[in-house]
Amino acid sequence: MKKIKILITGGCGFVGTNLALYLNNYFKIECADNLSRKGSRYNLNLLKINKIKNYNFDIKDFKKILKLPKYDLIIDCCAEASVEVSKKDIDRVVSTNLLGTINLLKKARYDKSKIIFLSTSRVYGISKLNSLVKSKNINKKLNIKKLINEKDDTTGAKSIYGLTKLSSEMFIEEFSYAFNLKYIINRCGVISGPLQFGKQDQGFISLWIWKHLNKDNLNYIGYGGHGNQIRDVLHITDLCKLILIQIRKINMINNKIFTVGGSSQSYTSLSELTNICQKITNNKIKIGKKKITSIYDIPYYITDNKLVKKTYNWEPKKNIYDVVTDTYMWILKNKKKLIKYF
């Protein structure tokens, strides 16, 4: 039987590399990545070891995209995913996140490829998410409130990053309507696990672990500086397993949007994450307070996985302790190689 041929864009990023390595056991995988991100060359070496080809170019270059082979499926993981960067460098974020996706859609149209698009929880309006927590100074532990699903409000300000991803979703739906493109859109919350090189505004789980392991300082930022903001966290392996199921069923189940996250099975506040990191690393570090809240920050987000569970009989198997432990073990094993990336 002929192997399905898949292109993963952003293939040397955290999600893209994990997906490529996982799906390579089942399909013919190739990647495209311009190697602009920190850590991408580390991940490129892993692809080479596993004989996965990477095309080194920018997906904004449509002429180069057209020269790529024909694929049965494109998985679009390429994004400038930092909310704060999106405020400072609008042109780069729009050209990468939106125009890059449009180029892939044109390629998919010509080749009659299907597409799986990794979107974000940031498509939802900030004011609606802020309304879930009344106080701007969260000085006590939050309880689980509403779970966010596919039908929740996407109107209003959401960050330039979130806007580009929502706009990409709309272009995908238009291409589906006009050109019979088959697609799946996954609106993912926080994703973490091995191969993630963390920063303050992106990849905070791996950053927290790295700082504890190296006895370096951190800050709780916003909402009074108490560290009580809550996010659900999806282990990258759980996401890979879901996408494998989606690929196998895409001829039967397509043209749908799913919210995908750790949900109530895997969530944490920053203060709780600190406690977990202290236990795992056996190190206690200084945590400062920065009380001023970014206009793009939100106090609470937990995904409702009801639809994706009903559709694919899938739910996360790994909890927040698994996420932290697995990431810690990867960092510990490769610490000398990773120093220049954190």
Regions found by a protein language model. Name each.
Residues 1-189, 326:
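N-terminal Rossmann-like NAD(P)+-binding domain of SDR-like oxidoreductases, especially those catalyzing
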Residues 36, 75, 82, 90, ...:
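Generic anion/oxyanion-binding catalytic loop in active/binding sites
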Residues 60, 88, 96-99, 152, ...:
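Residue-level signal for the nucleotide or nucleotide-sugar donor/cofactor binding architecture
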Residues 64, 70, 92, 99, ...:
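Residue-level recognition of oxygen-bearing side chains
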Residues 38, 124, 192, 227, ...:
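Flexible, glycine-rich phosphate/dinucleotide-binding loops
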Residues 18, 57, 213-342:
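C-terminal substrate-binding subdomain of Rossmann-fold SDR/epimerase-dehydratase oxidoreductases
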Residues 43, 82, 204-208, 297, ...:
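Activation loop
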Residues 129-146, 160, 170-247, 273-280:
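NAD(P)-dependent short-chain dehydrogenase/reductase
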